[in-house]
Amino acid sequence: ILMMMQSILGNTRKADITFYASGRIDISARVAKHLQLSRGDVLDIMIDQDEFYLYVRLRSPNGRHEAMVFPTNKAGNHFRTSSSRLCTAILQECKATAKARLCVGEPTENEYGKLLPIITKYLL
């Protein structure tokens, strides 16, 4: 008799960044630390061939901007932002409908500053 055993936890890797169909983007403390995020920074995603890179487009600019980050609580280092355009692009790339829970790779630098590759091929 062959029993099919299954792990309750399955994949225990937590997402670094989560994109929702509503336009909400949740950013982990790990990503915030790599990008040195602070309240009011504006995020963007750059595409190079099939690679997607998260970076800080503007550091605490004046006025209201799409994808401007804010901390989710006083003590933590998690951030949240909102951008329908960024979410739509990522959800389409991942072939997801409601949300895409993703990891990021090791940061690289270029003329735009620090870039974090978003691993879109592997949904959590």
What name fits each language-model region?
Residues I1-S7, N11-D16, I47-L124:
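Mature exported/compartmentalized surface modules and terminal targeting/interaction regions
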Residues A21:
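Short, surface-exposed binding/anchoring microloops in extracellular/periplasmic proteins
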Residues L2, T18, I27-V31:
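The feature marks the first
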Residues R24-Q36, T81-L91:
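Short beta-strand-centered segments at strand-helix junctions
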Residues R30-Y53:
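Acidic (E/D-rich), amphipathic helical modules within compact regulatory domains
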